């Protein structure tokens, strides 16, 4: 079997549908959806270090959803693309890659990359963009991401296992504007989910974990009904 087809099949059979009320999924064909969360573009495919993989050319969650006929609300899409690109340019400008070999030899690479790093804050979406999106669609999709832990940098409870303050704020804003909300968990470990009960608008909840190179494509197929999710949690 082709490597990409195998990767997609594994991802499809691993994604767990934790909640689906009022037949929220599959999404209606060509329905416009308000996408939120930095991980829709900064999609997490694999771990780091020895758990890392070559994911060059892999589609993001946003891209693969578009490929499957889901229409992202354009103003929000533009906002997130701008913020992500701005962040990438800043990081590239500030890092001197000519120093890498020197850093490895000195041991400072461990000091930089071998320590715990908290999840990145969610972007603060302007209220006007949320209002405008809510006028066009009643459905939103939020992607929550986690990519930390291992080798003396195990995850923390505050703002890691539990939601960050910026994630809490985003959820509150989205659930106060949209009747139907889908939450996708693109996380490398369990997180607290008690907050789901606080928001009746969260109709669907999907755990995709760190799904590999074809994970975003597999998720898009599930959201549109092309594939039925068949994954199970290890503890249930």
Region spans (language model):
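C-terminal non-catalytic regions of proteins with extracellular/luminal or membrane-system context
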Residues: 1-236
């Amino acid at each position: 079997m082709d490597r990409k087809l195998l990767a997609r099949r594994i991802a499809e059979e691993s994604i767990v549908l934790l909640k689906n009320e009022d037949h929220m999924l599959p999404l209606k064909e060509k329905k416009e959806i308000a996408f939120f969360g930095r991980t829709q573009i900064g999609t997490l495919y694999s771990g780091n270090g020895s758990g890392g993989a070559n994911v060059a050319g892999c589609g993001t969650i946003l891209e693969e959803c578009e490929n499957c006929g889901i229409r992202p609300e354009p103003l929000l899409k533009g906002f997130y693309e701008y913020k992500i690109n701005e962040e990438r340019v800043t990081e590239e400008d500030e890092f001197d890659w000519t120093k890498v070999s020197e850093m490895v030899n000195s041991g400072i690479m461990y000091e930089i990359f071998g320590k715990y790093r908290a999840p990145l804050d969610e972007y603060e979406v302007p209220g006007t963009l949320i209002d405008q999106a809510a006028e066009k669609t009643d459905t939103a999709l939020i992607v929550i991401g986690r990519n930390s832990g291992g080798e003396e940098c195990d995850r923390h409870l505050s703002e890691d296992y539990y939601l960050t303050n910026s994630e809490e704020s985003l959820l509150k804003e989205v659930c106060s504007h949209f009747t139907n909300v889908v939450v996708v968990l693109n996380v490398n470990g369990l997180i607290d989910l008690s907050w789901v009960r606080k928001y009746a608008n969260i109709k669907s909840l999907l755990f995709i974990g760190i799904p590999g190179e074809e994970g975003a494509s597999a998720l898009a197929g599930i959201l549109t009904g092309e594939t039925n999710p068949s994954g199970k949690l290890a503890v249930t």
